[in-house]
A protein has these predicted regions:
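A generic "functional-site adjacency" signal
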Residues: 5, 18-19, 160
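Alpha-helical transmembrane segments of integral membrane proteins
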Residues: 9-12, 16, 72, 147-154, ...
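Hydrophobic transmembrane alpha-helices and their membrane-interface boundaries in multi-pass
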Residues: 14-89, 93-102, 120-122
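Juxtamembrane loop-helix boundary motifs flanking transmembrane segments in multi-pass membrane proteins
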Residues: 3, 56-59, 95, 134-141, ...
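Alpha-helical transmembrane segments and their interfaces in multipass membrane proteins
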Residues: 28-47, 51, 87-88, 110, ...
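Long cytosolic alpha-helical coiled-coil signaling stalks of chemosensory transducers
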Residues: 171-173, 177-179
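Short, Lys/Arg-rich, polar N-terminal cytosolic tail immediately upstream
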Residues: 1-9
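Canonical bilayer-spanning transmembrane alpha-helix
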Residues: 98-115
C-alpha cells in the first residue's frame, strides 16, 4: 500500500466511525433539546448502514465507499439541522455542512468532494421547497439557498484544487521513489 492509499484508508476508517457515532450523538442532542428522536435516529441508522454495507461489500478504498462516505458526511449535518428546527441555533448548525465538506478532502478524492457538495446543494434546494423549516428557522428562502450555494461552490473549488494537487504530489513522489 502506498502513502496515498494509507491516508485514504485511515481517513475512510475514521469517517466511517464518525458517521456511526451519530447514531448515539443524534438522540443525545434530541434529548438535550427535548424533541422527539425516533425519526432522526432512524435516519442516522439508515445512512450509517448504507456506509457500513458499502464498505463491507466494496472495500475500504473503493470509489463507491468514498462516495457513500461523502454522502454520509453531508447527510449527518442535514439530520442535525432538521433536529434543530425552530431552535435559535438552527442556522448556526449550518456551519457543520461546511466543516463536513472540508473533511471529505482527507480522502484525497476530488470526485468524493463533488459528490459531497452536490449532496448539500440538492438537500438545501429540495428542502427549501418541500420542508423549509428543516433547514432555515424563518422557512423558505431561495436567496439564502443561493448564498449558501455560492459559499459551497467557493469552498469546493479550493478543496478540489487541494485534492488534485495532493494526489499528483503522491503520484510524483511514488514515481521518483521507483526510479
Amino acid at each position: 500500500m502506498n502513502d496515498l492509499q494509507t491516508i485514504r484508508t485511515r481517513a475512510a476508517k475514521m469517517f466511517i466511525l464518525f458517521i456511526f457515532a451519530h447514531i448515539v450523538l443524534i438522540p443525545i442532542i434530541a434529548i438535550i433539546l427535548d424533541v422527539p428522536f425516533l425519526d432522526v435516529t432512524i435516519m442516522a441508522i439508515a445512512v450509517s448502514l448504507a456506509v457500513g454495507l458499502t464498505w463491507k461489500f466494496a472495500g475500504i478504498n473503493a470509489a463507491a465507499t468514498h462516495y457513500i462516505i461523502a454522502v454520509g458526511l453531508s447527510l449527518m449535518p442535514a439530520i442535525i439541522t432538521y433536529l434543530f428546527k425552530g431552535h435559535p441555533w438552527q442556522i448556526d448548525i449550518h456551519m457543520y455542512f461546511f466543516a463536513s465538506l472540508a473533511m471529505v478532502t482527507a480522502l484525497c478524492n476530488w470526485r468524493a468532494i463533488i459528490i459531497a457538495a452536490a449532496t448539500v446543494a440538492v438537500h438545501h434546494l429540495v428542502l427549501n421547497f418541500l420542508l423549509p423549516v428543516a433547514i432555515f428557522p424563518s422557512g423558505a428562502d431561495f436567496f439564502r439557498v443561493v448564498l449558501h450555494a455560492v459559499i459551497v461552490i467557493a469552498e469546493t473549488v479550493v478543496l478540489l484544487w487541494l485534492a488534485i494537487k495532493l494526489e499528483a504530489a503522491f503520484s510524483q513522489g511514488a514515481a521518483a521513489l521507483s526510479e
